[in-house]
Swiss-Prot record:
Protein name: ATP synthase subunit b, chloroplastic
Assembly, per entry: F-type ATPases have 2 components, F(1) - the catalytic core - and F(0) - the membrane proton channel. F(1) has five subunits: alpha(3), beta(3), gamma(1), delta(1), epsilon(1). F(0) has four main subunits: a(1), b(1), b'(1) and c(10-14). The alpha and beta chains form an alternating ring which encloses part of the gamma chain. F(1) is attached to F(0) by a central stalk formed by the gamma and epsilon chains, while a peripheral stalk is formed by the delta, b and b' chains.
CDD domains documented for this protein: ATP-synt_Fo_b
Organism field: Cycas taitungensis (Prince sago)
Cited HAMAP family: ATP_synth_b_bprime
GO cellular component terms given for this protein: chloroplast thylakoid membrane; proton-transporting ATP synthase complex
Extra information: In plastids the F-type ATPase is also known as CF(1)CF(0).
Subcellular location: Plastid, Chloroplast thylakoid membrane
Entry's Gene Ontology molecular function annotations: proton-transporting ATP synthase activity, rotational mechanism
Lipid bilayer topology: Single-pass membrane protein
């Protein structure tokens, strides 16, 4: 049986825990590098992104205006079709004696034609909106890609000096020689 003194005595020989703590070396943790990169991204990317979004907004608004005009044209045609339907109905009342079935066929044909026209216009409007949206998305992607390439090229050109350039060429030449020696 183990008593209380044996238990406390055995705890006295355990080494204290070590190795836990915070790294206070700012250069070792890359906080400065990370903050500089984030600052540069925010500073340069903000203007480009807002310009792209403004352009996209204008394109969407113009597409919506075009779609609304198409919709107004469709409603005008629908009103004309309804007016014609009213005329047909009035004529149907006048010649009801001569053939009720003929009148019904004309009425159905007119309604079907109006519905088909409206559906075609609605489909055309939806296709136009989808096409314009996709085109705008593609343009935004292209603009972002071009801008990123320009910035990357500018960064490379600003950081590439003669010494670094010569070291890179020497390194590549030595790699080619090593490859040539291994193939021989």
């Amino acid at each position: 049986m183990i008593n209380g003194t044996d238990f406390s005595f055995s705890l006295g020989y355990w080494p204290p825990a070590g190795g836990f703590g915070l790294n206070t070396n700012i250069l070792g943790t890359n906080l400065i590098n990370l903050s500089v990169v984030l600052g540069v991204l925010i500073y340069f990317g903000k203007g480009v992104l807002s310009n792209l979004l403004d352009d996209r907004k204008q394109k969407i608004l113009s597409t919506i205006r075009d779609s609304e005009e198409l919709y107004k044209g469709a409603t005008d045609q629908l009103e004309k079709a309804r007016a014609r339907l009213r005329e047909v109905e009035m004529r149907a009342d006048e010649i009801q004696v001569n053939g009720y079935s003929q009148i019904e066929r004309e009425k159905e044909d007119l309604i079907n034609a109006a519905h088909e026209n409206l559906e075609r216009l609605e489909d055309s409007k939806n296709e136009t909106v989808n096409f314009e949206q996709q085109r705008a998305i593609d343009q935004v992607r292209q603009q972002i890609s071009r801008q990123a390439l320009r910035r990357a090229l500018g960064t490379l050109n600003s950081r590439l000096n003669n010494e670094l350039h010569l070291r890179t060429i020497d390194h590549n030449i030595s790699m080619l020689r090593a490859m040539k020696n291994t193939t021989d």
